[in-house]
Design a protein with these regions (language model features):
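Glycine-rich, positively charged active-site loop/lid region within alpha/beta enzyme cores that binds
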Residues: 1-9, 56-63, 160-223, 293-299
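N-terminal binding-site loop/beta-alpha segment at the start of enzyme catalytic domains
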Residues: 1-48, 116, 189-190
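Glycine/proline-rich, positively charged
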Residues: 4, 57-150, 154
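Structural preference for beta-strand elements that scaffold enzyme active sites
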Residues: 17-18, 43-49, 89-92, 120-124, ...
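Conserved, mostly hydrophobic/aromatic
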Residues: 19, 34, 46, 81, ...
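Active-site beta-loop-alpha junctions enriched in small/polar residues
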Residues: 22-24, 49-53, 95-98, 122, ...
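Generic structural signal for well-ordered alpha-helices
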Residues: 31, 35, 78-82, 108-112, ...
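Conserved short secondary-structure transition element at the edge of the structured enzyme core
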Residues: 206-271
Length: 299
């Protein structure tokens, strides 16, 4: 949550009900902000996550707590999230990343115990859960867009087999897919998604900031101009109509922006129809050209 004012319910105009946050977002203040807006009374569904930075040095800042998916930390930080959100339960709780310092059997047992206590609904390891009679994962949140399709050949078949919904983030590539940037030499706004002086910026630059991606972007901009479409519109209409995501499986698109104006336009674009064949052809060719350089969907 990077913006907002109490009493504004623009999202509800579009019948949006689900809010996605995480303990790590804006140093925990995202959860705290959401806790102040009476989200339950507004009829909203709340999802949050716990990232295990103990296993990922690059996500450990000076003085920050070391968080794992051990039973102790799961209980401790779920309680912190619940207090920040001013609730006694949430609808979905994600294990935000892999914790290779804690055996999955130990983590899943703890998650199941918390579920039975009524602290969370769905969460997102199927074999371990089935073997032990634990609650099974119900959702996977991952990166997916027209120029990053690494999830298609391996992950989607797995999710479909086990009845797990896919929650997609990064439909606009963190802003890369908006036409805002055009070359490796472009200046970026301090604190933005591609700021090389920030950890998040370095991650996004590793993902998209290279010559093959900029060449693909140039081809997409040309076809966008020809059909009088915006780059963001192309990205959102692709994910809505031409990706492997299906509403009947419970799949969902996560969108975010720096202003309510951007959110409103994104929602409008998501509701538009399929893209022209020529645009799809250019997108497919763009993905083929960058796929050897695309980062893994997992870490």
């Amino acid at each position: 949550m990077t913006f907002g004012e109490e009493g504004k319910e623009g999202a509800r105009v579009n019948d949006l009900k689900e809010v996605d946050t995480a303990r790590t977002y804006t140093g925990g203040t995202s959860e705290e902000y959401l806790g102040k807006i009476n989200w339950k009374k507004r009829g909203l569904v709340m999802d949050t996550k716990l990232y295990p930075n103990v296993a990922h040095v690059r996500f450990q800042s000076t003085g920050s707590a070391r968080i794992s998916h051990s039973p102790e930390d799961l209980r401790k930080y779920l309680d912190i999230s619940l207090k920040a959100l001013q609730t006694d339960s949430i609808d979905m709780w994600y294990l935000h990343g892999p914790d290779r310092s804690t055996p999955y059997e130990v983590t899943m047992k703890a998650v199941n115990e918390l579920y039975k206590e009524g602290n969370h609904g769905m969460y997102t390891i199927v074999g371990i859960c089935r073997a032990n009679g634990y609650i099974q994962p119900t959702a996977y949140q991952g990166i997916y867009n027209a120029i990053h399709r690494k999830v298609e050949p391996e992950l989607f078949p797995c999710l479909r087999k086990f009845g797990i919904a896919f929650y997609e983030f990064n439909p606009l590539g963190g802003g890369f897919f908006t036409g805002r940037y055009r070359s490796l030499q472009d200046e970026v706004e301090p604190g933005s998604r591609f700021d090389p002086n920030k950890g998040q910026g370095r991650n996004y630059r590793a993902r998209y900031w290279n010559e093959p991606y900029f060449r693909a972007l140039s081809a997409m901009e040309a076809v966008a101009e020809k059909h009088n479409l915006t780059m963001a519109e192309i990205a959102l209409r692709w994910i809505s109509h031409h990706s492997l995501m299906k509403r009947e499986y419970g799949d969902a698109v996560l969108i975010g922006a720096s202003s309510t104006k951007h959110i409103e336009q994104n929602l409008i674009d998501l509701e538009k129809g399929p893209l022209p064949e020529e645009v799809l052809k250019v997108l497919d060719e763009a993905w083929l050209s960058v796929s050897p350089y695309a980062t893994p969907y997992f870490h």
